[in-house]
């Protein structure tokens, strides 16, 4: 089978998130953890992008002029605020329901986002390219991590960045991110994450580096119960984020 004939889409995952699509923008609904997670990942993205492209992170629209892909965008929780920072955003998701919810919310909020019900493979085959690709909380839901990451990396322009965030495959993550979050605290519906599909940092880095990109930064992220918010941490045993850069053209 040729690479172009393969797919990174896990239809059972698409169906699971499509069934919850109406709750994307409810801060107390099934996507509450992502609403809580948004501030720390947005700050991380903004600061790192601005550092790379020589922008002022405190500017009103610091990402003005940059083309950004939010792959696996869901209902648009990340796409919208990134667009508000001035970026030209393409939000892609294989779920028609997710894209419908995202498009409606953006229109009602007066935010311009180019939402498309497409896969990473379809975008790459169409010759799309981006200054920044956001691959956030997605790899643990795809059918082929290496192919997915490689496909995304091919669309990063010279000098551009790719961000990734996911959950580590450790016993600590199994206890906290799956058992506690889904069965005890009920923050997420049961079955949202499967332990065997979680991705270790080195497993995520391998296809990124093989695609000609350099890992520039890694960080753990932890939830502070007392503060009721997520913070960056050196501990990558559960949640973590990383940023990679494609070398600038000679």
Swiss-Prot record:
<dbReference type="InterPro" id="IPR010233">
    <property type="entry name" value="UbiG_MeTrfase"/>
</dbReference>
<keyword id="KW-0949">S-adenosyl-L-methionine</keyword>
<feature type="binding site">
    <location>
        <position position="41"/>
    </location>
    <ligand>
        <name>S-adenosyl-L-methionine</name>
    </ligand>
</feature>
<dbReference type="GO" id="GO:0032259">
    <property type="term" value="P:methylation"/>
</dbReference>
<dbReference type="Pfam" id="PF08241">
    <property type="entry name" value="Methyltransf_11"/>
</dbReference>
<keyword id="KW-0808">Transferase</keyword>
<feature type="binding site">
    <location>
        <position position="72"/>
    </location>
    <ligand>
        <name>S-adenosyl-L-methionine</name>
    </ligand>
</feature>
<dbReference type="GO" id="GO:0010420">
    <property type="term" value="F:polyprenyldihydroxybenzoate methyltransferase activity"/>
</dbReference>
<dbReference type="GO" id="GO:0061542">
    <property type="term" value="F:3-demethylubiquinol 3-O-methyltransferase activity"/>
</dbReference>
<feature type="binding site">
    <location>
        <position position="93"/>
    </location>
    <ligand>
        <name>S-adenosyl-L-methionine</name>
    </ligand>
</feature>
<comment type="function">
    <text>O-methyltransferase that catalyzes the 2 O-methylation steps in the ubiquinone biosynthetic pathway.</text>
</comment>
<protein>
    <recommendedName>
        <fullName>Ubiquinone biosynthesis O-methyltransferase</fullName>
        <ecNumber>2.1.1.222</ecNumber>
        <ecNumber>2.1.1.64</ecNumber>
    </recommendedName>
</protein>
<keyword id="KW-0831">Ubiquinone biosynthesis</keyword>
<keyword id="KW-0489">Methyltransferase</keyword>
<feature type="binding site">
    <location>
        <position position="136"/>
    </location>
    <ligand>
        <name>S-adenosyl-L-methionine</name>
    </ligand>
</feature>
<comment type="pathway">
    <text>Cofactor biosynthesis; ubiquinone biosynthesis.</text>
</comment>
<dbReference type="GO" id="GO:0102208">
    <property type="term" value="F:2-polyprenyl-6-hydroxyphenol methylase activity"/>
</dbReference>
<dbReference type="InterPro" id="IPR013216">
    <property type="entry name" value="Methyltransf_11"/>
</dbReference>
<comment type="similarity">
    <text>Belongs to the methyltransferase superfamily. UbiG/COQ3 family.</text>
</comment>
<dbReference type="InterPro" id="IPR029063">
    <property type="entry name" value="SAM-dependent_MTases_sf"/>
</dbReference>
């Amino acid at each position: 089978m040729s690479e172009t004939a393969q797919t990174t889409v896990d239809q059972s995952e698409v169906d699971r998130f499509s069934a919850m699509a109406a709750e994307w923008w409810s801060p107390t609904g099934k996507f509450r953890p992502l609403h809580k997670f948004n501030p720390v990942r947005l700050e991380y993205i903004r600061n790192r992008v601005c550092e790379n492209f020589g922008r002022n992170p405190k500017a009103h629209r610091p990402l003005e002029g940059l083309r950004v892909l939010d792959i696996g965008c869901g209902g648009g929780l990340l796409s919208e605020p990134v667009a508000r920072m001035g970026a030209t955003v393409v939000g892609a998701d294989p779920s028609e329901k997710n894209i419908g919810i995202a498009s409606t919310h953006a229109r009602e909020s007066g935010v311009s986002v180019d939402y498309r019900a497409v896969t990473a493979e379809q975008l790459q085959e169409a010759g799309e390219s981006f200054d920044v690709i956001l691959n956030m909380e997605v790899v643990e839901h795809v059918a082929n991590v290496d192919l997915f990451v490689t496909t995304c990396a091919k669309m990063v322009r010279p000098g551009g960045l790719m961000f990734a965030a996911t959950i580590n495959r450790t016993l600590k993550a199994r206890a906290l991110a799956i058992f506690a979050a889904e069965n005890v605290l009920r923050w997420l519906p049961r079955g949202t994450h499967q332990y065997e599909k979680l991705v270790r940092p080195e497993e995520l880095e391998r296809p990124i580096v093989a695609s000609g990109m350099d890992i520039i930064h890694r960080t753990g992220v932890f939830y502070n119960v007392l503060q009721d918010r997520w913070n960056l941490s050196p501990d990558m045993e559960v949640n973590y984020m990383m940023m990679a850069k494609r070398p600038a053209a000679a």
